């Protein structure tokens, strides 16, 4: 752990804290229908889109109508992307003449990008045409992120409105999130990436001669435009196989800062937007502080674990003063690799600038735990906020039980219906993660994908189904996921982790929006102070994390203890 690494991390955290209120205020204005500067240019385009689609943005929807519109839109997007992947060999912009994507892989990929997961059981430059990357994946990067923002905004309205019947208009929220938030920021990010050397072309692949005299194929393509939105929209799927560890995706220190900052920017700002939209910025600051504490704690553990190096390597007499550098870019080192790993799993992003499978056991456990907690530590674009508010509901319920009062939040009584729906949303994660991992260990065809023995093999299984259920998309690379069994199983886990959380969340919004707000009384728990922040952190860790402790004890914790004791596990025969 070096002073240079600490300064880099402090710069990142300072930028995040500085931009949060600025972007948060802007997004609150966008979704409250107020005038904004980009609206001068984009307003006519927005109104034109409504006219073409026959949408009246002022006609709001009941939560059931909002949910039906969302599910229909995402189903259509999934089917169109599946068809595009299956028929890409017949379509233009395929200079490498890549064939059609197989049915199980096409299903997995279509589900992955529709659910904002971006799990990739393939290498982008060897599997997908330029058209598939642009028209298929990049489009879904925008609309899946906009879908998450729309759900978060609908839930905010549930808390903010009084005795209402509607939670907004899904189509209007989708368009505004795309036009006013995602598109401008992605455009600016893409310009910076092109400036720094990221490819943005339609050229054929280039064959180059290496210093040893051999040939190497250099992939090309419209990468910058996809990379910008995959970072910004908490998508994460790389244009190239090794994601942002590839020098074409992440060539300089500036691109590394920009891409890692884009990981959390919108998710952090949406928490501030929540405070603005409910009329009490203290509420947003309290939630932001809680997740900031969890984020910094996880980052500290990960960086410490990686900076210590591998004791098995040290025992061989190898110099390890730079820490555990296996699977890492030398230009970024342990500090920036740990920062990215924690940020990408705190958000539901999943992009990487280092290989998580090569992290030390505890260093790899923190990213896994971030996802197991429901990715509410800032979380994905929109998804992080509505997941966090589900835990807020559980926290005030627990507080109400302790003092013997009906729980309430922002004046809205939290009753049996909201608690049941919140519990359903929380139970999705252990069902998908532990259920998928258990199935993998007992089905021989699925277990064959595990390439490492012992505790690390279990960690690879856990990480895969945690990433899929949490809609993250990162992976421990020792897990061979491109099989019909896992393409199907992981695809189902992604669908479960996305829509089995969204539906109860929107139901909570519909229930809350109909309630009147009661004034705070002498027994009301203040939800903007230190006590509530502590209670919320405890709820996230205990309710969200304790379920997974036995699995973590058998995986990364057991691996850490074995490694410390000098016990190693051989390769799978």
UniProtKB/Swiss-Prot annotation:
- This protein's gene is called kdpA
Species whose genome carries this gene: Rhodospirillum centenum (strain ATCC 51521 / SW)
Stated name of the protein: Potassium-transporting ATPase potassium-binding subunit
Membrane-crossing residues?
Answer: 3-23, 65-85, 136-156, 179-199, 254-274, 286-306, 383-403, 423-443, 489-509, 531-551
**What PANTHER family does the annotation carry?**
POTASSIUM-TRANSPORTING ATPASE A CHAIN, POTASSIUM-TRANSPORTING ATPASE POTASSIUM-BINDING SUBUNIT
Ion transport as UniProt keyword: yes
Family to which the UniProt record says this protein belongs: Belongs to the KdpA family.
Instruction: Please name the InterPro entries in this protein's record.
Output: KdpA
| Main function | Part of the high-affinity ATP-driven potassium transport (or Kdp) system, which catalyzes the hydrolysis of ATP coupled with the electrogenic transport of potassium into the cytoplasm. This subunit binds the periplasmic potassium ions and delivers the ions to the membrane domain of KdpB through an intramembrane tunnel.
MF annotations from Gene Ontology: P-type potassium transmembrane transporter activity; potassium ion binding
Report the subcellular localization.
Cell inner membrane
Q: Name one Pfam family in it.
A: KdpA
Q: Which GO terms describe its cellular component?
A: plasma membrane
State the annotated membrane topology for this chain. Multi-pass membrane protein
Its quaternary organisation is: The system is composed of three essential subunits: KdpA, KdpB and KdpC.
List the NCBIfam families hit by this protein, alphabetically. kdpA
Please provide the record's keywords in A-Z order: Cell inner membrane, Cell membrane, Ion transport, Membrane, Potassium, Potassium transport, Transmembrane, Transmembrane helix, Transport
Q: Is Cell membrane one of the keywords? A: yes
């Amino acid at each position: 752990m070096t002073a240079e690494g600490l300064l880099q991390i402090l710069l990142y955290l300072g930028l995040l804290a500085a931009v949060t209120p600025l972007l948060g205020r802007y997004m609150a204005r966008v979704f409250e229908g107020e005038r904004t500067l980009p609206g001068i240019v984009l307003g006519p385009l927005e109104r034109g889109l409504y006219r073409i689609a026959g949408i009246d943005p002022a006609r709001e929807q009941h939560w059931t109508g909002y949910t039906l519109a969302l599910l229909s839109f995402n189903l259509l997007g999934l089917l169109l992307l599946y068809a595009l992947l299956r028929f890409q060999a017949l379509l233009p912009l395929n200079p490498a003449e890549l064939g059609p994507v197989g049915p199980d892989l096409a299903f997995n990929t279509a589900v992955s990008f529709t659910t904002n997961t971006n799990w990739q059981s393939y290498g982008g430059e060897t599997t997908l045409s330029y058209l598939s990357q642009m028209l298929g994946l990049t489009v879904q990067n925008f609309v899946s992120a906009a879908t998450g923002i729309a759900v978060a905004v609908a839930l905010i309205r549930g808390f903010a409105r009084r005795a209402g019947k509607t939670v907004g208009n899904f189509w209007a929220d989708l368009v505004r999130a795309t036009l006013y938030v995602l598109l401008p920021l992605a455009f600016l990010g893409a310009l910076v990436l092109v400036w720094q050397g990221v490819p943005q072309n339609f050229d054929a692949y280039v064959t180059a001669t290496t210093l040893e005299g051999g040939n190497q194929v250099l992939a090309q393509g419209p990468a910058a435009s996809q990379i910008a939105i995959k970072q910004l929209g908490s998508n994460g799927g790389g244009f190239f196989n090794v994601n942002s560890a590839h020098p074409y995706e992440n060539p300089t220190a500036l691109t590394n800062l920009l891409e890692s900052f884009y990981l959390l920017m919108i998710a952090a700002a949406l928490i501030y937007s929540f405070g603005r939209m409910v009329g009490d910025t203290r509420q947003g600051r309290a939630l932001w502080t809680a997740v900031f504490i969890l984020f910094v704690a996880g980052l500290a553990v990960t960086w410490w674990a990686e900076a210590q190096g591998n004791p098995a390597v040290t025992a061989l007499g190898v110099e390890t003063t730079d820490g555990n550098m296996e699977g890492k870019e030398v230009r970024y080192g342990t500090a920036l690799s740990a920062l990215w790993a924690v940020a990408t799993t705190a958000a539901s992003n999943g992009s990487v600038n280092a290989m998580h499978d090569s992290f030390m056991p505890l260093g790899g456990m923190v990213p896994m735990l971030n996802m197991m907690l429901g990715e509410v530590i800032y979380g994905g674009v929109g998804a992080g906020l509505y997941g966090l508010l589900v835990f807020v509901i559980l926290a005030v319920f627990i507080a109400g039980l302790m003092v013997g009062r009906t729980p309430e939040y922002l004046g809205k009584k939290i009753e049996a219906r909201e608690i049941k729906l919140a519990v359903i949303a929380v139970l999705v994660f252990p069902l998908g993660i532990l259920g998928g991992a258990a199935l993998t260990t007992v089905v021989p065809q699925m277990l064959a994908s595990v390439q490492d023995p012992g505790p690390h093999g279990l960690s690879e299984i856990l990480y895969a189904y945690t990433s899929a259920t949490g809609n993250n998309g990162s992976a421990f690379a020792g897990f061979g996921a491109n099989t019909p069994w896992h393409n199907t199983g992981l695809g189902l886990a992604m669908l479960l982790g996305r829509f089995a959380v969204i539906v109860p969340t929107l139901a909570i919004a519909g229930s809350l929006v109909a309630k009147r707000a009661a004034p705070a009384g002498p027994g009301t728990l203040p939800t903007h102070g230190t006590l509530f922040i502590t209670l919320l952190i405890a709820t996230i860790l205990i309710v969200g994390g304790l379920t997974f402790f036995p699995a973590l004890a058998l995986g990364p914790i057991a691996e850490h203890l074995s490694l410390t004791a000098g016990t190693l596990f051989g390769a799978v025969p």
